[in-house]
Amino acid sequence: MAKMIVFDETARRALERGVNALADAVRVTLGPKGRNVVLEKKFGAPQIVNDGVTIAKEIELEDPLENTGAQLIREVASKTNDVAGDGTTTATVLAQALIREGLRNVAAGANPMSLKRGMEKTVAKLVQEIAAMAKPVEDNKTIAEVATISSGNDEEIGQMIAEAMDKVGKEGVITVEESKSLVTELDVVEGMQFDKGYVSPYFVTDTERMITDLDEPFILLTDKKISIIQDLIPVLEKVARAGRPLLIISEDLEGEALATLVVNKLRGVLNCVAVKAPGFGDRRKAMLQDIAVLTGGDVISEDIGLKLENVTIDMLGKARKVTITKDKTTIVAGTDNKAAVEKRIAQIHKQMEDTDSDFDREKLQERLAKLAGGVAVIKVGAATETELKDRKLRIEDALNATKAAVEEGIVPGGGTTLLHLTKKIDAIKAGLADDEKTGADLIARALEAPLRQIADNAGVEGSVIAQKVRELDFNIGYDAMKGEFVDMLAAGVADPAKVVRSALQNAASIAAMVLTTEVLIVDKPEKKKAGAGAPDMGGMGGMGGMGGMGGMM
């Protein structure tokens, strides 16, 4: 396919138009008085969202040059979401401000590479400042405040997440499910999470969030590497007849076996997912046994004379729900195996007492936490499907923000921390060369952008509010919900330091890339021929039967 090649200022301005198109759509959601965005869906009702990364992922521009800019800024939101789980809108607003100011300087003759170096050095110093000023999260009240702010000032969600963390611990597993009722409620159940995800992305059931949800699945546990489909066919046929999904946890699954499972999943013959067993060596066998106890199944191992071809339904584990991402599996078990789980916990306690090795004791402690901690499930209720999806996204954001706050502490929220960091820029500039100082000035101007946007969305003049806050003490900021200047931490308006840090780092990274771009190469759009309608395709004919499970052989 032919390519379009665009140079110099034309290339950078095209990127900027794309950046602005996406950022202008996202930034209206920032702050407690931010508005919503409605996303049209090809199937089903439109989706109403207030989440930066969800909006960013939906935007595709017609002009390929501008679309490249939009994709770059989408990367800012995605990366911030991956690292911190929240702060995607803040990152987008920062990146837009940096690119706008930076391109103005490049057009005026500043050296882009010097600007880039200045920005990088300044951000590195500011990240250290954020870490130094972060206050650790030590009580439930602070956790509730962070969750409330991140969920769009929903106090019910804030209290629920604080309660969930209290019940399963700060390292515990908290999942979010859709409820059948109108009420949002918290449920703590037996369950565990381990650090292995699906072996193939073809297993996902939700392509937007790239996760797999299995309701009431059977679970096949084996310490064997599976590569031949013949071994699995008997158990697959039994599960298919039962009409329930299947989770396979094995040492590995590859080759013909993996290909056949993927094909049958895509055809809708059997909803199945394969994940690798956690741990290594003897520890892997012990963890498989833990999962077996939790789910009421057996580990299929030739060490004890069990073979895959002889597996019966009774040997399979069962769970209420399983959620799998690319790197994590969460099993929410029923309550049927409580006695067996308690017996297993007592056994692990005994092993911990008997061992002399600190390493072994640490690993046993990890297993114990996985088994004993349980899983807190927040069941999201709402009056309509559209509200339910929006509420679920808000709760997931709040949950991520809370975990980030526990990890790296909190700083004053509402864009206050970023704005007050501008006071540190002069000291940083003292160690920079000429054009590098301009890079530091770019960062200083961009740091105002989130607070200005929060104020604008609240219906007041952003530049006036920013100027007033700059003159106040470090903790004092603008509470857009009440329209007052307050001590942000005392008022419960806090941001996780990790979210603020990630937003700044990712925004500066992408902005530096845009400023140092000299050539843009994209596919040339194909011109549609006038009057060329689609030819008559004729009838499609029937699809034919898919055959039974024997088609896998």
UniProtKB/Swiss-Prot annotation:
It is found in: Cytoplasm. GO terms for cellular component: GroEL-GroES complex. GO terms for molecular function: ATP binding; ATP-dependent protein folding chaperone; isomerase activity; unfolded protein binding. It comes from the Bacteria. ATP binds at residues 29-32, 86-90, 414, 495. Gene3D superfamilies: GroEL, GroEL-like equatorial domain, TCP-1-like chaperonin intermediate domain. Keywords: ATP-binding, Chaperone, Cytoplasm, Isomerase, Nucleotide-binding. Its EC number is 5.6.1.7. It catalyses: ATP + H2O + a folded polypeptide = ADP + phosphate + an unfolded polypeptide. InterPro entries: Chaperonin_Cpn60_CS, Cpn60/GroEL, Cpn60/GroEL/TCP-1, GroEL-like_apical_dom_sf, GROEL-like_equatorial_sf, TCP-1-like_intermed_sf. GO terms for biological process: chaperone cofactor-dependent protein refolding; protein refolding; response to heat. It is an enzyme of class 5 (isomerase). Forms a cylinder of 14 subunits composed of two heptameric rings stacked back-to-back. Interacts with the co-chaperonin GroES. Belongs to the chaperonin (HSP60) family. Together with its co-chaperonin GroES, plays an essential role in assisting protein folding. The GroEL-GroES system forms a nano-cage that allows encapsulation of the non-native substrate proteins and provides a physical environment optimized to promote and accelerate protein folding. This is Chaperonin GroEL 2.
